[in-house]
């Protein structure tokens, strides 16, 4: 079937008036490659040009007012090509002076006794407006409100040009309706054609809100249809491998561990084991706070697979983390399991031998990075795929790994506790196991907040820990200095400063621009206690495990979100020794102050994730752009979570009733298939 579109156009993008080769190239840089892309290129915000009563305006506020020109404008020139135009208006019986800089041409347009609309900053004391825009329209033609769409543009494209291009396209395209009449009527939604038209050219705020609501619901409904359909396919299209593990051997392995499992770990293991025995594929998320022992739970599951004659795979986002997982699992398993590590650094003969052993079944458990999904990586009999920190991988990467075993059980792990609402959006409908309990003997990390001027006191506190034979992390937001962020400390400068204080041999440097080999060398030195202080960016955020490190200083901590701060803090507190985390920050915003306060009040990652989500929104919540979240144009899974739940219920009903698979929905089914490029539906 040919490509299914939401919007169909009778002509190509370059047939629109004003779009020549040069404009076409600029539009392509904005990812606008078709008329459909142009129509769906929605405004990022709206400038409210509603005329207001000046008596109600706050001092220094940006206002839009209308008045009569009662004195001829004057222009004064100064400096080099600079000018100041002054005109007096009568606005609501108030004489107001209006000033425009470097717009002398306005003088000819500002006729005496004419009615004009001006936008600018209001100075109540001076009774003066510093104007930035002027509208020449007769008063009776002014609309009660005027919301002007503002688009993200590039140099070479003007707002008005883009608005005109979109206006022409809208007049000629056909916009298909995805929602049924019953659904629109039930939730009082508009047609999609009217909605898109309104998002580009709203008449008033109420009109815009209705359009936003309709488009958001449509996006959420389409997304949930995909998720519900995929969920149905995953549970019905393939029979799962039934893992007949040897429970006695598994119990012996658990008893041999050098520590006792927490109650939360035991519950999670039992939940996963029930899934492994079930006739449908496991699709479970294991989430737990930093240091809660998720890796041990994963290890027990891998061991169970081994007793049943199956291989396991564990994919992690970084080489450092892959190496640490491999090291800890080799230590846990001893001679009972053959664990192999596959990263981009494994090359040549060593790689060929590893792949040969993987394919003939000699390797029981393969741990690695993106290298696991390369075409030449072939398993003999994989029964369990575990993805750690899944939100850091694209859908495509996860899907390829899963397809290496057609009926494979899947376990996702994350140390970023995800609120239930967001978990559904990121991972789809799946079972969730949560570990909310730390291993015995762990002491809660003591977190404090210090201002920049208290830096020397923080250094003294760190020195005390070093004297006890402990180690420390020092975290910075930037690698090198930035002219845009002059007040933010950078990791290189702080590294050099600490070297002069503690000696070159005692301080290590780690950041994302270093080669994998260099990063590994520094981490190995820190792990072996060859260096005392590791100065780093957030590259240490996930999974780095050095139990002897008991002190962390996070410089310019207000530059990070709560979840990132909590992940960083989790690098300490991994032994029986008391650990400390000091946040150095002088926040200038209420949000920054609130963030620092919350961090000192709780060490509960689940509570922090909820607060972070409220404060930052889903995109920032994970600290990365490619967070695995659906890329909505209008909907926001946090603000619109009630709508998300309604959309999910409606989508589930449509899928479960079987109506979705009737002829009337064939167009919609094909659209969903084509827009889930990384997921197979056959």
UniProtKB/Swiss-Prot annotation:
SMART domains referenced in this protein's UniProt entry, alphabetically: DEXDc, HELICc
Signal peptide: none
Domain Helicase C-terminal, chain residue ranges per copy: 454-614
EC code: 5.6.2.4
Domain notes: The wedge domain within the N-terminus inserts into the replication fork junction, where the lagging and leading strand split.
Keywords on record: ATP-binding, DNA damage, DNA recombination, DNA repair, DNA-binding, Helicase, Hydrolase, Isomerase, Nucleotide-binding
Residue sites binding ATP per the record: 288-295
Its job: Plays a critical role in recombination and DNA repair. Helps process Holliday junction intermediates to mature products by catalyzing branch migration. Has replication fork regression activity, unwinds stalled or blocked replication forks to make a HJ that can be resolved. Has a DNA unwinding activity characteristic of a DNA helicase with 3'-5' polarity.
Organism (species): Staphylococcus epidermidis (strain ATCC 12228 / FDA PCI 1200)
Highest taxon listed in the record's lineage: Bacteria
A biological-process GO annotation: DNA repair
InterPro entries reported in the protein's UniProt record: ATP-dep_DNA_helicase_RecG, DEAD/DEAH_box_helicase_dom, Helicase_ATP-bd, Helicase_C-like, NA-bd_OB-fold, P-loop_NTPase, RecG/Mfd, RecG_dom3_C
Subunit structure: Monomer.
PROSITE patterns in alphabetical order: HELICASE_ATP_BIND_1, HELICASE_CTER
Family from the record: Belongs to the helicase family. RecG subfamily.
Record's keyword annotation contains Hydrolase: yes
Entry-linked Pfam families: DEAD, Helicase_C, RecG_dom3_C, RecG_wedge
GO molecular function term, any single one: ATP hydrolysis activity
Chain location of the short sequence motif DEAH box per the record: 388-391
Reactions the enzyme catalyzes: Couples ATP hydrolysis with the unwinding of duplex DNA by translocating in the 3'-5' direction; ATP + H2O = ADP + phosphate + H(+)
Name of the protein in question: ATP-dependent DNA helicase RecG
Classification via PANTHER family: ATP-DEPENDENT DNA HELICASE HOMOLOG RECG, CHLOROPLASTIC (PTHR47964:SF1)
Region described as Wedge domain: spans on this chain: 50-145
Gene (UniProt): recG
